[in-house]
UniProtKB/Swiss-Prot annotation:
Pathway: Isoprenoid biosynthesis; isopentenyl diphosphate biosynthesis via DXP pathway; isopentenyl diphosphate from 1-deoxy-D-xylulose 5-phosphate: step 2/6. The record marks R16, K23 as: Transition state stabilizer. Its EC number is 2.7.7.60. It holds the Pfam family IspD. It catalyses: 2-C-methyl-D-erythritol 4-phosphate + CTP + H(+) = 4-CDP-2-C-methyl-D-erythritol + diphosphate. Gene3D superfamilies: Spore Coat Polysaccharide Biosynthesis Protein SpsA, Chain A. This is 2-C-methyl-D-erythritol 4-phosphate cytidylyltransferase. It comes from Desulforamulus reducens (strain ATCC BAA-1160 / DSM 100696 / MI-1). GO terms for molecular function: 2-C-methyl-D-erythritol 4-phosphate cytidylyltransferase activity. One of its GO terms (biological process) is isopentenyl diphosphate biosynthetic process, methylerythritol 4-phosphate pathway. Keywords: Isoprene biosynthesis, Nucleotidyltransferase, Transferase. Belongs to the IspD/TarI cytidylyltransferase family. IspD subfamily. Catalyzes the formation of 4-diphosphocytidyl-2-C-methyl-D-erythritol from CTP and 2-C-methyl-D-erythritol 4-phosphate (MEP).
Length: 234
């Protein structure tokens, strides 16, 4: 079997956070969010390497704020991203060695994912080719038109909120991205690109704590979750 490499897109602007510092560099209990995220992936024995994708021109900043002073052993490269998350992920994919078997794509702003969840999703992806963490939605979801009027209410029992990591066979996800680029298709997650090829994607239930930190409210929740974990460990 080949290598399993993680790609962490961390090139987002973080405008909804409303801070001068980009969200991935904000401190979560005295460490940058991105450092927590890297640490979670470093702890997974199956993952042999990690590629960080940052905003163009921020490679040195990432070295100073994230990598310097942290004992990370699996960082393979820090590469510049693009204008969209999808482009950034593609840049990361193109930097991977040819003997890569599986790719673990994980948002830089999801620092609370746990080792067992990552290991589980890797196992499923190895079996079926594409798998992602997700949780059943708690609220009723409405489909609306451009004017804000409800046009449908999907069955909540069939709706899941997709998270990351999303893990794929390397050749499959690379082909999915290349196909999307040729067709000018943009999606909000990588699973959608694989789905467009007609390939099945397996969802595995994760944790509601695996939030993507996007707003100040998310930061408060992340602090609370992390504090509770630390209390359990003491």
């Amino acid at each position: 079997m080949g290598n399993i490499v993680a790609v962490i897109p961390a090139a987002g602007m973080g405008s909804r956070m409303g801070t001068e510092v980009k969200k991935q560099y904000l401190k979560l209990q005295d460490r940058p969010i991105l450092a927590h995220t890297i640490d979670a992936l470093e702890q997974v024995p199956d993952i042999t390497g990690i590629v960080l994708v940052v905003s163009p021109g921020e490679e040195t900043l990432c070295q100073e704020l994230i990598l310097k002073g942290n004992l990370f052993n699996k960082i393979m490269a820090v590469v510049p991203g693009g204008d969209h998350r999808q482009t950034s992920v593609y840049h990361g994919l193109c930097s991977l060695p040819g003997d890569t078997e599986l790719v673990v794509i994980h948002d830089g702003a999801r620092p609370l994912v746990q080792r067992a969840e990552i290991s589980h999703i890797i196992k499923e992806a190895r079996r079926v080719g594409a798998a992602a963490l997700a949780v059943p939605v708690k609220d009723t979801v409405k489909l609306v038109n451009d004017q804000g009027y409800v046009i449908a209410t999907p069955n909540r029992e069939k709706l899941w909120a997709v998270q990351t990591p999303q893990v794929f066979n390397y050749e499959l996800i690379l082909k999915a991205h290349q196909d999307a680029r040729e067709k000018g298709v943009y999606a909000t997650d990588d699973c959608a690109l694989v789905e467009a090829l007609g390939q099945p994607v397996k969802l595995v239930q994760g944790s509601y704590e695996n939030i993507k930190i996007t707003t100040p409210e998310d930061m408060v929740m992340a602090q609370a979750f992390l504090k509770r974990r630390n209390c359990w460990c003491e």
